[in-house]
Amino acid sequence: MAEVANNEQQAPQFNIQRVYTKDVSFETPNSPAVFQKEWNPEVKLDLDTRSAKLADDVYEVVLSLTVTAQNAGETAFLCEVQQAGIFSIAGLSEPQLAHSLGAYCPNILFPYAREAVGSLVGRGTFPQLNLAPVNFDALFAQYVQQRQAAAAAPAAEEANA
């Protein structure tokens, strides 16, 4: 019986407690002049994720998107969205937990953030903006590789000294 209880405690658990919009901002610094120009924008997407432990096995993950559209050398709009979620995560190893917080949870949050950006851009009366899907697994793997390389660099310098 105790063995069954231990197995249940060690089984991975993942629950979404809440998904919410933490912060939004939409600016059209050059309106109404921007509406008079031919629409041929350069759109730039910056994204960031961060997480914080709220309690035992409870984490907040925040996905921040900043979308900037330049048209004819001027900023047409700047849209910022922070989409957040509270997740219960238990029974994972440290690397698995890091992957969940850095890739899996942002993947859950992205469709909500994408919809918020699209809605704000539409309310600004700009043409529809559909953000392409983001491969958070690949971004997280790249982040891990960069951290490993940064950790290896000082060790290599010490070995050469």
Swiss-Prot record:
<dbReference type="InterPro" id="IPR003708">
    <property type="entry name" value="SecB"/>
</dbReference>
<dbReference type="GO" id="GO:0006457">
    <property type="term" value="P:protein folding"/>
</dbReference>
<keyword id="KW-0963">Cytoplasm</keyword>
<keyword id="KW-0813">Transport</keyword>
<comment type="subunit">
    <text>Homotetramer, a dimer of dimers. One homotetramer interacts with 1 SecA dimer.</text>
</comment>
<dbReference type="Pfam" id="PF02556">
    <property type="entry name" value="SecB"/>
</dbReference>
<dbReference type="GO" id="GO:0051082">
    <property type="term" value="F:unfolded protein binding"/>
</dbReference>
<keyword id="KW-0811">Translocation</keyword>
<dbReference type="GO" id="GO:0051262">
    <property type="term" value="P:protein tetramerization"/>
</dbReference>
<comment type="similarity">
    <text>Belongs to the SecB family.</text>
</comment>
<dbReference type="GO" id="GO:0005737">
    <property type="term" value="C:cytoplasm"/>
</dbReference>
<protein>
    <recommendedName>
        <fullName>Protein-export protein SecB</fullName>
    </recommendedName>
</protein>
<keyword id="KW-0653">Protein transport</keyword>
<dbReference type="GO" id="GO:0015031">
    <property type="term" value="P:protein transport"/>
</dbReference>
<dbReference type="InterPro" id="IPR035958">
    <property type="entry name" value="SecB-like_sf"/>
</dbReference>
<keyword id="KW-0143">Chaperone</keyword>
<comment type="function">
    <text>One of the proteins required for the normal export of preproteins out of the cell cytoplasm. It is a molecular chaperone that binds to a subset of precursor proteins, maintaining them in a translocation-competent state. It also specifically binds to its receptor SecA.</text>
</comment>
